[in-house]
Swiss-Prot record:
GO molecular function: ATP binding; glutaminyl-tRNA synthase (glutamine-hydrolyzing) activity
InterPro entries for this protein: Amidase, Amidase_CS, Amidase_dom, AS_sf, GatA
Keywords linked to the UniProt accession: ATP-binding, Ligase, Nucleotide-binding, Protein biosynthesis
Keyword Transcription recorded: no
SUPFAM superfamilies linked: Amidase signature (AS) enzymes
PANTHER family xref list: GLUTAMYL-TRNA(GLN) AMIDOTRANSFERASE SUBUNIT A, TRANSAMIDASE
GO BP terms: translation
Protein name as annotated: Glutamyl-tRNA(Gln) amidotransferase subunit A
């Protein structure tokens, strides 16, 4: 029998319904795995007492035939989803001991469906990073190793703790947030399915903000079916979030295994020209195109002429919004306060923020403050907003001809911890292929599609039309079936 902590969400639900095991046993297996692999630093707060209590309630519901959709299923939450009475830090010193008195809508939705929370996962500070190396709790180590080297690898970022937890069988699923690729890129690095829904599909209420016009909750799972199950539970209109979309939550599970016949897949191959894309990634992209063609899809060459400006646009707009959002952390209302005798209010602000924020966060606040200044507004911010509109228009034009778009998730496989740490520009380019869809607010997923020559997982990205998560899942499911001969599982786990 498969170890309980290695079961997918769908198989766990089936086993619990058939009374093959209890939720308490399922949760116990995950707790053992977390304790065994604490060296990966995937979790920053463990909620085992809560999880065992929730598991006991789940077993009672199964006994009484009152089981809900996710009854007894173990999940983890990135540490920027506020959890009532449970420390929520965004992995920043400025919020290191913050305990919210309210619950985020997304975690509440999962609790309402019977989900069991194992803990809060590590992340880049305030979700700013692509390698999970900016956390005040230390970096996360990927469960994966290259077959020619035993060096520790990054799990991707900013949701690296969630990716490591699911990839290392320390959770069946895990919540992340995706601003410019922070679910999709770690999923690619760790051999997982990472899904970012349409902007506004999942409520942002109770999510600690980075860039409000880009932030969206997402999910890590080990199968496309699991993604559809979790998305159905997470999504929905929320009057507490002014950016929430008033649209019915669709039935998504029937997308799994649907035919690709007569589907048109857009492929912007020109985006790979002259970029930093590795040969392994290019081969995986070409192989996936052939896979979809053989499955009945029509491949259409498209262009996204403004997508190449995506990284530049993102690193103007996102820091600008961060500069505004993070101004609330001043040492007055909540979080860290640095004080000394005879200190003025301005000195308290300065010392609190200088001490509380890490280097990458300070860098982005400074960039954002400049582009919002009188000298930077016209030259950078307003121009970036115009180009963002052009990026969205490019997608609209493409979707007039195709049903979905296929791109690599990342230009590289996972790299060594510290390898790119001293060059922010190189680090920012990790999001080269994920940022354009974020700027347009589109649903997208990364699904494992191959292994590099060094044995590391590579993800392919599917981008859909607004509110068309169904088609994204359909394509992802076809790719998943086409590579089922590949085992996307780290050695030793």
């Amino acid at each position: 029998m498969t170890e309980l902590n290695k079961l997918t969400v769908a198989d766990s639900i089936k086993g619990l319904k058939n009374k093959d095991f209890t939720s308490a046993e399922l949760i116990g297996a995950h707790i053992k795995q977390i304790e065994k692999h604490r060296n990966l630093n995937a979790y920053v707060t463990e909620t085992f007492d809560l999880a065992l209590k929730q598991a006991e309630a789940a077993d009672q519901n199964y006994a009484q035939n009152n089981a809900r959709t996710l009854e007894g299923i173990p999940f983890a939450a990135k540490d920027l989803f506020c959890t009532k009475g449970i420390r929520t830090t965004a992995c920043s010193n400025i919020l290191k001991n913050f305990i919210p008195n309210y619950e985020s809508s997304v975690t509440q939705n999962i609790f309402d469906k019977g989900g069991v929370m194992l803990g809060k996962t590590n992340m880049d500070e305030f979700a700013m990073g692509s390698a999970n190396i900016t956390s005040c709790f230390g970096n996360v180590i990927s469960p994966w190793k290259a077959n020619d080297d035993n060096a520790d690898l990054v799990p991707g970022g900013s949701s690296g703790g969630s990716a490591a937890a699911v990839s290392g069988f320390m959770a069946s699923a895990a919540l992340g947030s995706d601003t410019g690729g922070s679910v999709r890129q770690p999923a690619s690095f760790t051999g997982l399915v990472g899904f970012k829904p349409t902007y506004g599909r999942c409520s942002r209420y109770g999510m600690i903000s980075f860039a409000s016009s880009l932030d969206q909750a997402g999910i890590f799972t080990r199968s496309v079916l699991d993604s559809s199950i979790m998305l159905e539970a997470m999504m929905g209109f929320d009057e507490k979030d002014s950016t929430s979309i008033k649209a019915e939550v669709p039935e998504l599970q029937s997308a799994i295994g649907s035919s690709m016949k007569n589907m048109k897949m857009g492929v912007p191959l020109s985006l790979g020209e002259g970029s930093i894309i590795e040969p392994d990634i290019m081969k995986m992209w070409q192989d996936t195109i052939e896979l979809l063609k053989n499955a009945g899809a029509e491949i259409v060459d498209i262009t996204l002429p403004h997508a190449k400006y995506g990284v530049a646009v993102y690193y103007v707009i996102a820091p600008a919004e961060a500069s505004s959002n993070l101004s609330r952390y001043d040492g007055v209302r909540y979080g860290l306060r640095v004080e000394r005798e005879n200190m003025t209010l301005d000195e308290m602000y300065e010392m609190t923020r200088s001490t509380g924020f890490g280097e990458e966060v300070k860098r982005r606040i400074m960039i954002g403050t400049y582009v919002l200044s009188s000298s930077g507004m016209d030259a950078y911010y307003l121009k970036a907003q115009k180009v963002r509109r052009l990026v969205a228009n490019d997608f609209n034009n493409a979707f007039a001809k195709v049903d979905a778009i296929l791109l690599p998730t990342s230009p590289t496989a996972a790299f060594k911890i510290g390898e790119k740490q001293n060059d922010p520009t190189i680090m920012y380019l990790n999001d080269l292929f994920t940022i354009p869809a974020s700027l347009a607010g589109l649903p997208c997923a990364s699904v494992p599609a191959g292994l590099s020559a060094r044995g590391l997982p590579l993800g392919i990205q599917i981008i859909g039309k607004q509110l068309d998560e169904y088609t994204v899942l359909k394509v992802a499911s076809t790719i998943e079936s086409g590579v089922k001969h590949i085992k996307f599982e780290p050695k030793g786990f």
